């Protein structure tokens, strides 16, 4: 062998030398291929067989792209600008920090040594085992890591402070942050400790590292990153003032911290062999975060709220342009595109469905077997199925392969025919045919299976008693005799199935008459599935709006998220002349529940009810454009400014409503609040409030701030996305995107740019749709994987609904 090839990009390699077992050195001629992200080392003579050492001297730049080894800039408590250096390597960016074999299967032990300014602090995956001085540098040597993949290596250097470590067994758990923010670390540390204990018990294996540090980074592209022993986070996902935060803000911190801790086993200890299997990491971590948080805070009802996440995956997976959970990956851009709702939420939903089908204990036994068998190595989906099969004695591949390796999911239809309950399955799609677009010649998804093996739970009520009937729907149709005194049937009892349900008219009306007897997740699914079949053209929109009248007294915040989400979607579809009618409909649906709850919490009220109050205030003041709610919100916000106590679940809603009705003077006040926010959550509240101001000049001001450095590049793409989805700003935002695309492409993290482009689904008119296609075609923009095709198909679904239902909507909304 006279050639070595490894990954390197944006690096200058000054020297590459191989030292063989006899101490003989051979220098290489180095050729860098930036396009392939590889370095080729050519040697004059054949390298000796046996062990050797490759020594590489290289240089790089601390970039500002939030990937590889990059710089994060922030202001300290005195207002001075400071810089820290951090890493983000997943999926394929370790090669931007050091030459390496940057693929998940090339696991290795990493020995990190950092030479830094003596006044700074450094954190890496393991504990510091030696500290020395070399000239004007402090040299920190860290313990060897476990055998792990390159994307999990991490180091952070800067002015940092940390909490007092809390031991979990022999593992010290600490939170690190920039100076002045340690007061916000207690809640995140509490979650980290609780979830680490839970996972050690659930997995039956000790935590694989020698310490666990959680680090809040001011600039961070993703939500967090599961580097073994040195988990990095956005500040909003780790630092929080528990007393000042809303339930939603606390829940986000708990979910993200638990998710990353779950990865210490699923992902770090056992790693997928290649990026097509990334779901084994992310779906399991998403599933496990729910288990851990639900165990820690059962009153939060996380599995009910998970219905919202499941619905997001169902929305994308109902497209012809969806992909299987496990999908071929050939290039770094394709690997990056795998980090989506299909990998995370669909994957977690399918795991939850399988867990409920097998039983929690058998499922856990299989998980433990999988982790023990493949510890410190790599695995694939077949390895997981084998472990679960050994535990359950079930033919797991036969049941599960179509859920993982084929796109889409079934629509389970249920009807009464001839004294029998008839249950049918077919693939659910929003459009009857795939979207015709300029990239349609690209390879299509694998064909969906004719049928799935669907674990269906039916709750049949007859004679005042409910019984649960479990069936594995493997054929197109199955029939069950109706019991005497039949009253109703709930399909997907418990809400854990990854499929949609379509009831015939009579069965749907029977359920609507029994809403108080349905579980919250069942009511959520009833609304969400009804809206989906409406969007697919299988139910008139007027029937759906009639259905929403039955929920005026609904008290579950997740059900309301489905109701309000559908009204927000309609708001983007209706003709301008019909919008006042839709606003009135929104007020009619939401006002009764807010009137029942009142504007202030009552003694003993649970957190979910408090969050619902805030959600309804926001919806009525913005989507409903209710002048009375806007006036009351302004009064309460003014009282807050004078020092009055306002419930943290209501305050974000007040800020949003005041902005929606606000003028230029109020905009300047909120801009200053954004700049001087005391917590990451407060900063986010005022940042997104800037998008709610409706005057065209203020819309332009906010858009300009997304590219002039005032809004961090980690946040700016999401601000633009929000403005593309808002009716008052979408036109200006779209013109801005077209004009500034090159600037955004240069400034924003690639992940952020992909998410920003999702906002085009808000441009729901035929004219805008044509312009969107024209823009992306002319610019030859590729967002990786099927991302762009999915956005365009979602836009087509919205425009098709508008074209199909506009006349009926106009008549319905005009009626008293």
Q: At which residue positions do the language-model features occur?
A:
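Surface-exposed beta-strand/loop patches in extracellular or lumenal glycoproteins
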Residues: 1-10, 111-117, 429-457
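Aromatic/His-enriched, Gly/Pro-containing loop or helix-boundary segments
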Residues: 3, 25-47, 86-88, 92-95, ...
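Short edge-strand/loop segments of extracellular domains
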Residues: 8-12, 72-83, 219-222
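A surface-exposed beta-strand-loop module
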Residues: 10-76, 99-102, 134-136, 477-485
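Hydrophobic alpha-helical and helix-loop surface patches within well-folded domains
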Residues: 13, 24, 84, 142, ...
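Extended, low-hydrophobicity, Ser/Thr/Pro/Gly-biased non-transmembrane segments
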Residues: 39, 55-163, 168, 184-187, ...
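Long, ordered, helix-rich scaffold segments
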Residues: 310-312, 417, 422-424, 459-471, ...
